[in-house]
Regions:
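Core segments of transmembrane alpha-helices
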Residues: 692-696, 764-773
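Conserved cytosolic headpiece of P-type ATPases
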Residues: 1-746, 751-754, 811, 828-898
Length: 898
């Protein structure tokens, strides 16, 4: 690099002093939580805490029964089952989250040993990026990455890609105040750590290093844990509190009622009373244990784990398990523009260059190929990538798509002179001996159309300047970049000597278009919207989710992109868009008043999106944020769900909860659908298990008040718990997502997970089960029943002990009621028949396992399960009678559909 000035830079002593005073050029890595702490954190789940309490109480009961009542070791099955349920739920959640974390590369690793060219002691030298200190003089060349923040001392045709910090891919940098872009996010004479030089070169003095750089501030902010509670966590806490206080209330009622019954029925003696009181307390503790849905944590974990695995197939790599469900509660998505809504690759929108003759066609394609500093990486011919200026690269991509090899076109010419682009001249030129028109020397120029027009004396084709101006205005109103092309065939008799510097002489000789070039045409270049984005945005809007754009681009460009994807409409006013500087100037109160109506923040600074997220959260929105740049990291971390793009920066991925592998906005709609369906699956499990729990609690309550013992043995209850917990969780968690959920508005995050419809079903069906089971128990106790058909001719013969056959009938009826009710739970909130089995293979297999398992236990369980085999008639009668639960449910669903 040729320097305009002589710089001495720092000496060794100054380097040491500045390093001590301002710190090293290193980003503080995020604190890593030890593995054991991450595991222990799982025990903070409210339902897990309730289960732990229930497990301890269950152990106390078991020890009392084993040592005090001299019962067998089977009394320990219940507490063992509870702790197994706890370990399964925690273990699965921990395993899947750790597996997802390992699926991420080391995302926030920064190469601090990358060499950087600086001037020290008056000499250029290369040092490691980590060794840069404040006041170092750094040399920037094309392709280099700025190692720190600083102020430019020199800038020659310097263009920098700031997309990782502002979302803006190309920013012109200058040291001349008249060339400054007043609307730019950062000053035009300032460079930022992590940004890349796309064109030109420059020199800057370092002002900030490490965590003090803009990149560093974003990196540090992205590590802040805001401890935002997910909607599901809030709901499970409420459910846990409801179960806890309900069971405690019923337990107190039982204790008071039994004490009252004691004084009404027995003569008081302290020994007798204490024994009775201890028995009553054991019954109360049993009820509390029965009331706890120990399968719920496992059901939630299974649902989340299943969704994580299936969402990966739809290009959503979920890192944090609860993010699956939180997507379903999302009310607002804040997205950046570049790379998320658009392709982040400049492409030719339309080109209008005269090709009416073979010569004109040759001039057009040769001019595009040779008058360019960009090139293409064609290692993947189907997906070429641009190297160099994105705008020039777009023209080469257009040539490539038309089947022309720009490399061959360049190889066939002899370049005589080149005029690089400059902000002063606003055009560039190349003088060549043509390969397509042998023997001719041609000057090609391109640049701002008004500048190119100045140098032209005529136009190719039959278009007028008015036509061209009208077309340019139309494109510019669509926020597109426009360029003009012109050429001149230099005659052999030309007065100019063909050597380096001749292009400037030719252009300077042209006065007001006299003896000028021939205008070839114009081109519109834009970063096109991804094809799938408009439909994806429409899907989100139809689902009641607002989408807001936060970008470093201009308001005009942002509004045009918003219009193309369906976010910005004709009804929207200026109040719906704001610039970063205006946004920063808003007070918290003013922001609170405007935040719901804002649709676009243009020229946004790195921390603007984070402030927007926090303002939306203060308005009780559930916020998801998409982003691919380092500038997005704080907002990704602060949001309820952070969605990074697969080709985003490592800092963005580290801060996110979900990575969209294919960078497609449409994958976000799939994630919302999975989240909403997952929440419904959890509701279905709660509906199923709470119905069983209500029936079980009422049976314990009735038994306590009537003085009867439970007709179900410990081993039978273990099988019932296995059905209620593991099998039901697996069956209902594996239900596929429903497209229908995308027609609904987002649920109110404050609305209880047990909605009124569920409450009615839980109390109604649970109460009905209790009445049926209590009635059956009464009939079995007051008359000998050798077959189910005996119930048709039943008459009371007085109370007696139940036989094993009668206990087997009661046990099977109890299980089959739950079996059929599982079908009702599956159909909840679908609006369809329970026999709609599409994509429900897992559910079908599990209910078949339950049914076959019940038959095997009853027919072959013997003493272990305290059962005797039932005849075929009994089985048919039990199946038919208990299936009424399903048929009544189907009838009610049919009525509701009509």
């Amino acid at each position: 690099m040729e320097l305009k000035k002589i710089y001495t830079g720092l000496n060794a002593q100054e380097v040491a002093e500045n390093r001590k005073k301002y710190g090293e050029n290193l980003l503080t890595p995020p604190a890593q939580i030890p593995l054991w702490k991450r595991f222990i954190t799982k025990f903070k789940d409210p339902l897990i805490i309730i289960l732990l309490v229930a497990g301890v109480l269950s152990i106390a009961i078991s020890f009392y029964e084993y040592h005090g009542l001299h019962e067998g070791t089977e009394v320990f099955f219940e507490p063992v089952g509870i702790f197994i349920a706890i370990l399964l739920a925690i273990g699965m959640a921990f395993f899947f989250e750790e597996k997802a974390n390992r699926a991420f590369a080391i995302l926030n690793q920064v190469d601090d040993d990358e060499p950087v060219e600086v001037i020290r002691d008056g000499n250029p030298k290369k040092i490691a990026k980590r060794d840069i200190v404040v006041d170092d003089i750094v040399l920037l060349n094309t392709g280099a990455e700025a190692p720190a923040d600083g102020k430019l001392l020199e800038a020659i045709s310097l263009h920098i890609d700031e997309s990782t910090l502002t979302g803006e891919p190309i920013c012109h940098k200058s040291t001349h105040e008249e060339d400054f872009d007043k609307d730019a996010t950062f000053p035009s004479d300032y460079v930022l750590r992590g940004t890349k030089v796309m064109e030109g070169h420059g020199v800057f003095r370092v002002e900030k290093v490490g965590d003090n750089t803009e990149n560093g501030k974003v990196f540090v902010a992205s590590q802040i844990d805001n401890s935002v509670k997910t909607p599901l966590t809030e709901q499970l806490e409420r459910l846990g509190n409801l179960i806890t206080w309900s069971s405690y209330t019923i337990a107190v009622i039982i204790l008071i009622a039994r004490i009252a019954m004691f004084f009404l029925s027995y003569d008081f003696t302290w020994v007798h009373f204490l024994q009775y009181l201890l028995d009553s307390i054991m019954i109360c503790v049993t009820l509390i244990v029965v009331a706890v849905p120990e399968g719920l944590p496992m059901a939630v974990t299974l649902s989340l784990a299943y969704s994580m695995r299936r969402m990966l197939k739809t290009n959503n790599l979920v890192r944090k398990m609860h993010a699956c469900e939180t997507m379903g509660a999302t009310t607002v998505i804040c997205t950046d523009k570049t790379g998320t809504l658009t392709q982040n690759q400049m492409r030719v929108y339309k080109i209008e260059v005269d090709c009416s003759s073979e010569e004109h066609k040759a001039l057009a394609k040769e001019g595009i190929a040779v008058n360019s500093t960009a090139s293409l990486d064609l290692s993947d011919a189907q997906h070429p990538t641009v190297l160099g200026n994105p705008t020039e690269g777009a023209l080469l991509l257009w040539l490539h798509e038309k089947g022309y090899d720009y490399r061959q076109l360049r190889a066939d010419v002899e370049i005589i002179d080149e005029l690089p682009f400059s902000t002063e001249r606003k055009c560039m030129g190349t003088l060549v001996r043509s390969g397509l028109l042998p023997g001719k020397t041609i000057l090609y120029i391109k640049g701002a159309t008004d500048i190119i027009r100045y140098y032209c004396s005529d136009i190719m084709g039959d278009r007028s300047w008015d036509d061209i101006t009208a077309q340019l205005l139309k494109w510019q109103n669509q926020a597109m970049r426009t360029l003009g092309f012109a050429c001149m065939i230099i005659p052999d008799s030309s007065e100019f000597k063909l050597h380096e510097g001749v292009i400037s002489q030719i252009l300077d000789s042209i006065k007001d278009g006299n003896n000028g070039l021939t205008f070839q045409g114009i081109v519109a270049i834009a970063d096109p919207v991804r094809k799938e984005v408009p439909d994806a945005v429409r899907e989100c809007l139809d689902a009641g989710i607002d989408v807001k754009i936060v970008t470093g681009d201009t308001p005009g460009t942002a509004k045009e992109i918003g219009r193309q994807v369906g976010i910005w409409t004709e009804k929207d006013c200026d109040r719906c868009v704001i610039t970063g500087s205006e946004f920063e100037a808003l007070s918290d109160k003013e922001l609170s008043e405007r935040v719901n109506s804002l649709k676009i923040i243009a020229r946004a600074r790195p921390m603007d999106k984070k402030r927007l997220v926090e303002a939306l959260q203060a308005k009780h929105h559930v916020v998801a944020v998409t982003g691919d740049g380092t500038n997005d990291a704080p907002a990704l971390k602060a949001a309820h769900v952070g969605l990074s793009m697969g080709d985003g920066t490592s800092v963005a991925k580290e801060a996110s909860d979900i990575t969209i592998i294919d960078n497609s906005f449409s994958s976000i709609g799939r994630a919302v659908m999975w989240g909403r369906s997952l929440y419904q699956n959890i509701q279905r499990f709660i509906l199923f298990q709470m119905t069983v729990n209500v029936a079980a609690c009422l049976i314990v309550l009735a038994g306590a008040l009537l003085g009867t013992q439970s007709p179900l043995t410990v081993t039978q209850m273990l099988w019932v718990n296995l059905i209620m917990d593991t099998f039901a969780a697996m069956a209902l968690a594996s239900l596929p997502p429903s497209e229908a959920v995308m027609q609904n508005k987002p649920r109110d995050r404050k609305a209880f997970i047990i909605n009124p419809s569920m409450s009615r079903q839980i109390i109604g069906v649970g109460g009905l089960f209790f009445i049926l089971l209590l009635g059956l128990l009464y009939m079995l106790e007051y008359a000998p029943i050798n077959s189910m058909t005996d119930l048709l001719t039943w008459h009371s013969t007085g109370p007696r002990e139940l036989t094993n056959h009668e206990l087997s009938i009661f046990f099977t009826v109890f299980v089959m009621l739950q079996f059929w009710n599982m079908f009702n739970a599956r159909a909840f909130a679908t609006g369809k028949s329970t026999f709609h089995f599409k994509d429900c293979k897992g559910f079908g297999i599990i209910v078949l396992v339950i049914f076959i398992g019940q038959i095997i236990i009853v027919q072959f369980g013997g003493k272990m399960f305290n059962v005797t085999p039932l005849c075929l008639t009994d089985w048919i009668a039990i199946i038919v009678v208990t299936s009424l639960v399903l048929w009544v449910g189907e009838l009610l669903r049919l009525i509701n559909r009509k």
